[in-house]
Protein backbone atom coordinates (compact mmCIF):
# COMPACT_ATOMS: atom_id res chain seq x y z
CA UNK A 1 0.00 0.00 0.00
CA UNK A 2 2.80 2.42 0.88
CA UNK A 3 4.48 1.69 -2.46
CA UNK A 4 1.23 2.31 -4.34
CA UNK A 5 0.66 5.62 -2.55
CA UNK A 6 4.24 6.65 -3.31
CA UNK A 7 3.78 5.93 -7.01
CA UNK A 8 0.55 7.92 -7.07
CA UNK A 9 2.22 10.90 -5.38
CA UNK A 10 5.16 10.75 -7.78
CA UNK A 11 2.81 10.68 -10.74
CA UNK A 12 0.95 13.75 -9.49
CA UNK A 13 4.13 15.82 -9.28
CA UNK A 14 4.39 18.45 -12.02
CA UNK A 15 6.34 17.56 -15.12
CA UNK A 16 8.80 20.37 -14.42
CA UNK A 17 10.21 18.44 -11.47
CA UNK A 18 11.21 15.55 -13.71
CA UNK A 19 12.72 17.67 -16.47
CA UNK A 20 13.90 20.86 -14.82
CA UNK A 21 17.64 20.36 -14.72
CA UNK A 22 20.61 20.49 -17.04
CA UNK A 23 21.74 16.92 -16.51
CA UNK A 24 23.06 15.12 -19.58
CA UNK A 25 20.41 13.36 -21.61
CA UNK A 26 20.15 10.47 -24.07
CA UNK A 27 17.12 11.57 -26.09
CA UNK A 28 16.48 8.84 -28.66
CA UNK A 29 17.65 5.55 -30.11
CA UNK A 30 21.47 5.76 -30.11
CA UNK A 31 21.49 8.96 -28.07
CA UNK A 32 22.26 12.53 -29.16
CA UNK A 33 21.54 12.90 -32.91
CA UNK A 34 21.59 9.10 -33.16
CA UNK A 35 25.39 9.18 -32.85
CA UNK A 36 25.86 6.65 -30.06
CA UNK A 37 28.29 9.08 -28.41
CA UNK A 38 28.06 10.67 -24.96
CA UNK A 39 30.61 13.48 -25.04
CA UNK A 40 32.05 14.52 -21.69
CA UNK A 41 30.48 11.64 -19.74
CA UNK A 42 32.37 9.23 -17.52
CA UNK A 43 30.65 5.90 -16.87
CA UNK A 44 32.61 2.86 -15.67
CA UNK A 45 34.20 0.45 -18.11
CA UNK A 46 33.94 -2.38 -15.59
CA UNK A 47 30.49 -3.71 -14.75
CA UNK A 48 28.66 -6.93 -14.00
CA UNK A 49 25.92 -8.48 -11.85
CA UNK A 50 27.93 -7.60 -8.74
CA UNK A 51 30.19 -4.84 -10.08
CA UNK A 52 29.44 -1.10 -10.07
CA UNK A 53 25.67 -1.68 -9.86
CA UNK A 54 24.04 1.62 -8.90
CA UNK A 55 20.61 0.06 -9.09
CA UNK A 56 18.76 -2.77 -10.79
CA UNK A 57 15.03 -2.70 -11.51
CA UNK A 58 12.76 -5.43 -12.90
CA UNK A 59 11.09 -4.48 -16.19
CA UNK A 60 8.38 -6.08 -18.33
CA UNK A 61 9.25 -7.59 -21.69
CA UNK A 62 10.22 -5.46 -24.66
CA UNK A 63 13.08 -4.73 -27.04
CA UNK A 64 13.16 -0.93 -26.97
CA UNK A 65 16.25 0.88 -25.73
CA UNK A 66 16.22 3.28 -22.76
CA UNK A 67 16.23 7.04 -23.25
CA UNK A 68 17.10 9.62 -20.60
CA UNK A 69 15.67 13.08 -19.97
CA UNK A 70 15.83 15.11 -16.76
CA UNK A 71 15.32 12.73 -13.84
CA UNK A 72 13.76 9.99 -15.95
CA UNK A 73 14.87 6.83 -17.71
CA UNK A 74 12.14 5.80 -20.15
CA UNK A 75 11.38 2.58 -22.03
CA UNK A 76 8.41 0.95 -23.70
CA UNK A 77 7.23 -2.47 -22.51
CA UNK A 78 4.63 -5.18 -23.03
CA UNK A 79 2.75 -6.70 -20.10
CA UNK A 80 -0.65 -8.37 -19.75
CA UNK A 81 -1.45 -7.66 -23.40
CA UNK A 82 -0.94 -3.92 -22.88
CA UNK A 83 1.62 -1.57 -24.42
CA UNK A 84 3.26 0.77 -21.94
CA UNK A 85 5.59 3.71 -21.83
CA UNK A 86 7.31 3.44 -18.43
CA UNK A 87 9.45 6.03 -16.66
CA UNK A 88 11.92 5.20 -13.89
CA UNK A 89 13.67 7.54 -11.49
CA UNK A 90 17.17 8.03 -12.82
CA UNK A 91 18.77 8.08 -9.38
CA UNK A 92 16.97 5.22 -7.63
CA UNK A 93 15.50 3.05 -10.37
CA UNK A 94 12.02 3.27 -8.87
CA UNK A 95 9.10 3.29 -11.29
CA UNK A 96 7.66 6.81 -11.50
CA UNK A 97 4.82 6.30 -13.93
CA UNK A 98 3.52 4.06 -16.68
CA UNK A 99 1.08 4.99 -19.43
CA UNK A 100 -1.03 2.54 -21.41
CA UNK A 101 -1.05 3.21 -25.17
CA UNK A 102 -4.59 1.77 -25.26
CA UNK A 103 -4.10 -0.15 -28.47
CA UNK A 104 -7.30 -1.70 -29.75
CA UNK A 105 -5.45 -4.52 -31.48
CA UNK A 106 -1.89 -5.83 -31.40
CA UNK A 107 0.15 -5.96 -34.58
CA UNK A 108 1.27 -9.40 -35.71
CA UNK A 109 4.85 -9.96 -34.56
CA UNK A 110 7.43 -12.73 -34.45
CA UNK A 111 7.03 -14.47 -31.10
CA UNK A 112 10.67 -15.61 -31.05
CA UNK A 113 12.63 -12.55 -32.15
CA UNK A 114 10.13 -9.69 -32.24
CA UNK A 115 8.08 -7.65 -29.78
CA UNK A 116 5.14 -5.23 -29.99
CA UNK A 117 7.35 -2.83 -28.01
CA UNK A 118 10.55 -2.87 -30.05
CA UNK A 119 10.63 0.84 -30.92
CA UNK A 120 12.61 3.25 -28.73
CA UNK A 121 10.88 6.47 -27.58
CA UNK A 122 12.22 9.94 -28.40
CA UNK A 123 12.27 13.20 -26.44
CA UNK A 124 13.31 16.82 -26.85
CA UNK A 125 13.31 17.41 -23.10
CA UNK A 126 9.69 18.50 -22.67
CA UNK A 127 7.68 15.60 -24.02
CA UNK A 128 8.14 11.91 -24.77
CA UNK A 129 6.96 10.33 -28.01
CA UNK A 130 6.49 6.56 -28.23
CA UNK A 131 5.71 4.54 -31.33
CA UNK A 132 3.83 1.26 -31.32
CA UNK A 133 3.26 -0.65 -34.55
CA UNK A 134 -0.11 -1.61 -33.11
CA UNK A 135 -1.59 1.89 -32.84
CA UNK A 136 0.81 4.63 -33.96
CA UNK A 137 2.44 7.52 -32.08
CA UNK A 138 1.55 8.61 -28.55
CA UNK A 139 2.99 11.72 -26.84
CA UNK A 140 3.24 12.30 -23.08
CA UNK A 141 4.52 15.07 -20.87
CA UNK A 142 7.25 14.25 -18.37
CA UNK A 143 4.68 13.27 -15.75
CA UNK A 144 3.10 10.70 -18.04
CA UNK A 145 0.06 12.76 -19.01
CA UNK A 146 -1.11 12.08 -22.60
CA UNK A 147 -0.71 15.15 -24.81
CA UNK A 148 -1.65 13.81 -28.24
CA UNK A 149 -1.82 10.67 -30.32
CA UNK A 150 -1.46 10.00 -34.03
CA UNK A 151 -3.55 6.92 -34.64
CA UNK A 152 -2.36 4.38 -37.20
CA UNK A 153 -3.74 0.92 -38.03
CA UNK A 154 -1.74 -2.11 -36.89
CA UNK A 155 1.37 -2.40 -39.05
CA UNK A 156 1.32 -5.36 -41.42
CA UNK A 157 5.08 -5.83 -41.60
CA UNK A 158 6.83 -8.14 -44.04
CA UNK A 159 6.25 -11.73 -43.00
CA UNK A 160 4.54 -10.55 -39.83
CA UNK A 161 7.87 -9.96 -38.11
CA UNK A 162 6.68 -6.82 -36.29
CA UNK A 163 7.80 -3.20 -36.11
CA UNK A 164 11.30 -2.13 -35.15
CA UNK A 165 11.94 1.39 -36.42
CA UNK A 166 12.04 4.22 -33.86
CA UNK A 167 10.83 7.83 -34.15
CA UNK A 168 13.20 10.79 -34.00
CA UNK A 169 12.60 14.44 -33.13
CA UNK A 170 14.44 17.12 -35.11
CA UNK A 171 13.74 20.87 -35.07
CA UNK A 172 10.41 20.37 -33.35
CA UNK A 173 9.34 17.70 -35.83
CA UNK A 174 8.60 14.05 -35.05
CA UNK A 175 9.64 11.82 -37.94
CA UNK A 176 8.55 8.21 -38.35
CA UNK A 177 9.20 5.74 -41.17
CA UNK A 178 6.72 2.91 -41.66
CA UNK A 179 7.68 0.51 -44.46
CA UNK A 180 5.33 -2.42 -45.10
CA UNK A 181 4.49 -4.46 -48.21
CA UNK A 182 1.01 -2.91 -48.38
CA UNK A 183 1.87 0.73 -47.71
CA UNK A 184 5.20 2.41 -47.06
CA UNK A 185 5.50 6.02 -46.01
CA UNK A 186 7.36 8.56 -43.93
CA UNK A 187 5.37 11.00 -41.79
CA UNK A 188 6.38 14.23 -40.04
CA UNK A 189 4.35 15.68 -37.16
CA UNK A 190 4.51 18.83 -35.07
CA UNK A 191 6.08 17.68 -31.79
CA UNK A 192 3.91 20.02 -29.70
CA UNK A 193 0.49 19.37 -31.23
CA UNK A 194 0.84 16.08 -33.10
CA UNK A 195 -0.48 17.75 -36.24
CA UNK A 196 0.64 16.15 -39.49
CA UNK A 197 3.12 18.41 -41.29
CA UNK A 198 3.71 16.19 -44.30
CA UNK A 199 3.90 12.61 -45.44
CA UNK A 200 5.59 10.98 -48.40
CA UNK A 201 4.94 7.62 -50.00
CA UNK A 202 7.84 5.19 -50.24
CA UNK A 203 8.60 2.17 -52.41
CA UNK A 204 10.43 0.16 -49.73
CA UNK A 205 8.43 -2.96 -48.75
CA UNK A 206 10.39 -3.49 -45.57
CA UNK A 207 12.86 -1.61 -43.37
CA UNK A 208 13.78 -1.47 -39.69
CA UNK A 209 16.30 1.35 -39.97
CA UNK A 210 15.73 4.41 -37.80
CA UNK A 211 16.21 7.64 -39.79
CA UNK A 212 18.81 10.29 -39.02
CA UNK A 213 18.69 14.09 -39.37
CA UNK A 214 21.46 15.59 -41.53
CA UNK A 215 22.43 19.27 -41.63
CA UNK A 216 23.45 20.02 -45.22
CA UNK A 217 24.36 23.23 -47.10
CA UNK A 218 20.85 23.25 -48.60
CA UNK A 219 19.01 22.68 -45.32
CA UNK A 220 18.26 19.93 -42.85
CA UNK A 221 17.31 16.56 -44.28
CA UNK A 222 16.04 13.31 -42.84
CA UNK A 223 17.80 10.27 -44.29
CA UNK A 224 16.22 6.83 -44.49
CA UNK A 225 17.97 3.57 -45.36
CA UNK A 226 15.35 1.29 -46.90
CA UNK A 227 15.13 -1.77 -49.08
CA UNK A 228 18.02 -1.51 -51.60
CA UNK A 229 17.89 2.30 -51.57
CA UNK A 230 18.69 5.28 -49.33
CA UNK A 231 16.70 8.52 -49.65
CA UNK A 232 17.19 12.03 -48.29
CA UNK A 233 14.02 14.05 -47.62
CA UNK A 234 13.71 17.76 -46.91
CA UNK A 235 12.84 17.96 -43.21
CA UNK A 236 10.52 20.95 -43.68
CA UNK A 237 8.58 19.83 -46.74
CA UNK A 238 9.11 16.10 -47.20
CA UNK A 239 10.37 16.60 -50.75
CA UNK A 240 12.79 13.92 -51.93
CA UNK A 241 16.17 15.61 -52.44
CA UNK A 242 18.34 12.66 -53.41
CA UNK A 243 18.59 8.90 -53.45
CA UNK A 244 21.17 6.21 -54.01
CA UNK A 245 21.12 2.52 -54.80
CA UNK A 246 23.19 0.15 -52.71
CA UNK A 247 21.68 -0.68 -49.32
CA UNK A 248 20.77 -4.17 -48.07
CA UNK A 249 17.49 -5.83 -48.96
CA UNK A 250 16.43 -5.81 -45.32
CA UNK A 251 17.85 -2.70 -43.63
CA UNK A 252 18.07 -3.01 -39.85
CA UNK A 253 21.05 -0.77 -39.04
CA UNK A 254 20.90 3.03 -39.14
CA UNK A 255 23.06 5.75 -40.71
CA UNK A 256 25.10 8.14 -38.59
CA UNK A 257 26.39 11.67 -39.21
CA UNK A 258 29.89 12.83 -38.24
CA UNK A 259 31.70 15.97 -39.35
CA UNK A 260 29.07 16.68 -41.98
CA UNK A 261 29.53 13.26 -43.59
CA UNK A 262 26.95 10.46 -43.59
CA UNK A 263 28.10 6.92 -42.83
CA UNK A 264 26.20 3.68 -43.25
CA UNK A 265 27.00 0.00 -42.89
CA UNK A 266 24.49 -2.79 -43.31
CA UNK A 267 24.14 -6.45 -44.14
CA UNK A 268 21.22 -8.70 -44.95
CA UNK A 269 21.19 -12.37 -45.96
CA UNK A 270 21.28 -13.27 -49.62
CA UNK A 271 22.70 -10.19 -51.31
CA UNK A 272 24.45 -10.66 -54.67
CA UNK A 273 27.87 -10.38 -53.04
CA UNK A 274 26.95 -12.30 -49.90
CA UNK A 275 29.63 -14.92 -49.36
CA UNK A 276 28.32 -15.87 -45.92
CA UNK A 277 24.78 -16.96 -46.76
CA UNK A 278 24.35 -19.11 -49.83
CA UNK A 279 20.62 -19.44 -50.44
CA UNK A 280 19.65 -22.88 -51.80
CA UNK A 281 17.46 -23.44 -54.83
CA UNK A 282 13.94 -24.62 -54.15
CA UNK A 283 14.71 -27.95 -55.83
CA UNK A 284 17.61 -28.45 -53.43
CA UNK A 285 15.32 -27.65 -50.49
CA UNK A 286 12.75 -30.18 -51.71
CA UNK A 287 15.43 -32.84 -52.04
CA UNK A 288 16.73 -32.21 -48.51
CA UNK A 289 13.53 -31.40 -46.60
CA UNK A 290 10.33 -32.44 -48.39
CA UNK A 291 9.65 -35.65 -46.50
CA UNK A 292 6.01 -36.00 -47.54
CA UNK A 293 6.84 -35.25 -51.20
CA UNK A 294 4.05 -32.69 -51.61
CA UNK A 295 6.23 -30.15 -53.43
CA UNK A 296 6.32 -27.69 -50.51
CA UNK A 297 8.22 -27.21 -47.24
CA UNK A 298 6.15 -27.34 -44.06
CA UNK A 299 7.14 -25.75 -40.77
CA UNK A 300 8.03 -29.17 -39.38
CA UNK A 301 10.10 -30.07 -42.44
CA UNK A 302 11.98 -26.77 -42.25
CA UNK A 303 13.01 -27.53 -38.68
CA UNK A 304 15.78 -25.51 -37.06
CA UNK A 305 16.98 -24.16 -40.41
CA UNK A 306 13.87 -21.98 -40.62
CA UNK A 307 13.20 -21.55 -36.91
CA UNK A 308 12.07 -17.99 -36.18
CA UNK A 309 11.93 -17.15 -39.91
CA UNK A 310 9.20 -19.44 -41.22
CA UNK A 311 6.36 -16.96 -40.68
CA UNK A 312 8.28 -14.32 -42.62
CA UNK A 313 8.66 -16.68 -45.59
CA UNK A 314 5.14 -18.13 -45.58
CA UNK A 315 3.43 -15.44 -47.63
CA UNK A 316 -0.12 -16.83 -47.66
CA UNK A 317 0.08 -18.25 -44.12
CA UNK A 318 -0.84 -21.82 -45.10
CA UNK A 319 2.06 -23.24 -43.06
CA UNK A 320 3.92 -24.22 -46.21
CA UNK A 321 6.62 -22.59 -48.31
CA UNK A 322 6.02 -23.02 -52.03
CA UNK A 323 8.27 -22.50 -55.02
CA UNK A 324 6.57 -19.18 -55.82
CA UNK A 325 7.04 -17.92 -52.27
CA UNK A 326 10.70 -18.92 -52.32
CA UNK A 327 11.20 -17.08 -55.63
CA UNK A 328 9.75 -13.91 -54.07
CA UNK A 329 12.19 -14.21 -51.18
CA UNK A 330 15.20 -14.75 -53.45
CA UNK A 331 14.24 -11.78 -55.63
CA UNK A 332 13.82 -9.55 -52.57
CA UNK A 333 17.22 -10.57 -51.21
CA UNK A 334 19.01 -10.19 -54.54
CA UNK A 335 17.91 -6.57 -54.94
CA UNK A 336 20.00 -5.38 -52.00
CA UNK A 337 23.73 -4.73 -51.65
CA UNK A 338 25.67 -5.31 -48.45
CA UNK A 339 28.32 -2.66 -47.89
CA UNK A 340 29.71 0.16 -45.78
CA UNK A 341 30.15 3.65 -47.17
CA UNK A 342 30.71 7.35 -46.51
CA UNK A 343 28.64 9.96 -48.31
CA UNK A 344 29.23 13.68 -48.77
CA UNK A 345 26.37 16.17 -48.64
CA UNK A 346 25.08 18.54 -51.30
CA UNK A 347 23.73 16.13 -53.87
CA UNK A 348 20.41 16.08 -55.70
CA UNK A 349 18.75 13.35 -57.74
CA UNK A 350 20.53 10.02 -58.06
CA UNK A 351 23.86 10.35 -56.24
CA UNK A 352 24.85 6.67 -56.26
CA UNK A 353 28.15 7.43 -57.98
CA UNK A 354 28.63 11.17 -57.61
CA UNK A 355 28.77 11.65 -53.83
CA UNK A 356 30.30 8.44 -52.54
CA UNK A 357 33.54 9.18 -50.64
CA UNK A 358 34.45 5.55 -50.07
CA UNK A 359 32.83 2.13 -50.04
CA UNK A 360 33.80 -1.19 -48.44
CA UNK A 361 32.36 -4.68 -48.32
CA UNK A 362 33.75 -6.27 -45.15
CA UNK A 363 32.56 -6.48 -41.57
CA UNK A 364 29.06 -5.05 -41.99
CA UNK A 365 26.63 -5.64 -39.13
CA UNK A 366 23.15 -7.11 -39.49
CA UNK A 367 21.38 -5.38 -36.59
CA UNK A 368 23.93 -3.32 -34.65
CA UNK A 369 24.48 0.12 -36.21
CA UNK A 370 28.10 1.23 -36.59
CA UNK A 371 29.64 4.24 -34.84
CA UNK A 372 32.06 7.01 -35.81
CA UNK A 373 34.46 7.67 -32.95
CA UNK A 374 38.15 8.35 -32.47
CA UNK A 375 38.63 9.06 -36.18
CA UNK A 376 37.29 5.65 -37.12
CA UNK A 377 34.10 4.03 -38.38
CA UNK A 378 33.70 1.02 -36.10
CA UNK A 379 31.23 -1.85 -36.36
CA UNK A 380 30.58 -5.18 -34.68
CA UNK A 381 29.00 -8.19 -36.34
CA UNK A 382 27.76 -11.48 -34.95
CA UNK A 383 30.60 -13.52 -33.50
CA UNK A 384 32.16 -10.48 -31.87
CA UNK A 385 34.07 -9.47 -35.01
CA UNK A 386 35.02 -5.80 -34.75
CA UNK A 387 35.99 -3.91 -37.91
CA UNK A 388 37.46 -0.40 -37.99
CA UNK A 389 37.81 1.82 -41.06
CA UNK A 390 39.56 5.17 -41.21
CA UNK A 391 36.81 7.78 -41.02
CA UNK A 392 38.24 9.93 -43.82
CA UNK A 393 39.81 7.48 -46.25
CA UNK A 394 37.92 4.25 -45.63
CA UNK A 395 41.20 2.37 -45.21
CA UNK A 396 40.72 -0.82 -43.22
CA UNK A 397 42.57 -0.54 -39.91
CA UNK A 398 41.66 -3.92 -38.47
CA UNK A 399 39.11 -6.72 -38.44
CA UNK A 400 39.42 -9.04 -35.49
CA UNK A 401 37.37 -10.91 -32.92
CA UNK A 402 37.62 -8.37 -30.12
CA UNK A 403 34.23 -8.67 -28.41
CA UNK A 404 32.38 -11.59 -26.85
CA UNK A 405 31.07 -14.25 -29.22
CA UNK A 406 27.41 -14.65 -30.11
CA UNK A 407 24.89 -12.38 -31.78
CA UNK A 408 24.81 -8.57 -31.54
CA UNK A 409 21.50 -6.69 -31.52
CA UNK A 410 22.60 -3.69 -29.44
CA UNK A 411 24.53 -0.95 -31.23
CA UNK A 412 27.91 0.13 -29.84
CA UNK A 413 28.08 3.30 -27.76
CA UNK A 414 31.10 5.44 -26.89
CA UNK A 415 32.50 8.02 -24.51
CA UNK A 416 35.72 8.98 -22.72
CA UNK A 417 37.92 7.25 -25.29
CA UNK A 418 36.16 3.89 -25.09
CA UNK A 419 33.65 1.95 -27.19
CA UNK A 420 31.17 -0.42 -25.52
CA UNK A 421 29.86 -3.59 -27.22
CA UNK A 422 27.05 -5.58 -25.59
CA UNK A 423 26.39 -9.15 -26.73
CA UNK A 424 22.85 -10.41 -27.18
CA UNK A 425 23.08 -13.97 -25.92
CA UNK A 426 24.25 -13.37 -22.34
CA UNK A 427 24.75 -9.62 -21.96
CA UNK A 428 28.55 -9.55 -21.96
CA UNK A 429 29.87 -5.98 -22.20
CA UNK A 430 33.27 -5.67 -23.89
CA UNK A 431 35.00 -2.28 -23.84
CA UNK A 432 37.80 -1.38 -26.24
CA UNK A 433 40.01 1.67 -26.52
CA UNK A 434 39.02 3.97 -29.37
CA UNK A 435 41.29 5.22 -32.15
CA UNK A 436 43.82 2.38 -32.10
CA UNK A 437 45.25 0.52 -35.09
CA UNK A 438 44.66 -2.80 -33.35
CA UNK A 439 41.72 -3.60 -31.04
CA UNK A 440 42.82 -3.06 -27.45
CA UNK A 441 40.37 -4.52 -24.95
CA UNK A 442 40.08 -2.29 -21.90
CA UNK A 443 37.53 -4.48 -20.11
CA UNK A 444 35.81 -7.78 -20.79
CA UNK A 445 33.10 -7.96 -18.19
CA UNK A 446 31.27 -10.95 -16.72
CA UNK A 447 27.95 -11.75 -18.42
CA UNK A 448 24.79 -10.18 -17.05
CA UNK A 449 23.18 -13.57 -17.56
CA UNK A 450 20.27 -12.33 -19.67
CA UNK A 451 19.71 -11.55 -23.31
CA UNK A 452 20.28 -7.95 -24.36
CA UNK A 453 18.65 -6.54 -27.49
CA UNK A 454 18.51 -2.90 -26.39
CA UNK A 455 21.26 -0.37 -27.06
CA UNK A 456 22.73 1.03 -23.81
CA UNK A 457 22.23 4.67 -22.82
CA UNK A 458 24.93 6.85 -21.26
CA UNK A 459 24.39 9.99 -19.20
CA UNK A 460 26.71 11.52 -16.61
CA UNK A 461 28.67 8.88 -14.74
CA UNK A 462 26.17 6.13 -15.49
CA UNK A 463 25.55 3.62 -18.25
CA UNK A 464 22.05 2.13 -18.41
CA UNK A 465 21.53 -1.34 -19.87
CA UNK A 466 18.20 -3.05 -20.44
CA UNK A 467 18.25 -6.83 -20.38
CA UNK A 468 15.37 -9.20 -21.06
CA UNK A 469 14.06 -8.76 -17.53
CA UNK A 470 15.87 -5.85 -15.87
CA UNK A 471 17.09 -2.30 -16.25
CA UNK A 472 20.59 -1.77 -14.85
CA UNK A 473 22.33 1.45 -13.91
CA UNK A 474 26.11 1.07 -13.61
CA UNK A 475 28.25 3.79 -12.02
CA UNK A 476 31.63 3.93 -10.31
List where the protein language model places each region.
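Positively charged n-region of N-terminal signal peptides that target proteins for export
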Residues: 1-5, 476
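Bacterial N-terminal signal peptides
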Residues: 4-16
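Noncatalytic, solvent-exposed loop/strand surfaces
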Residues: 18-476
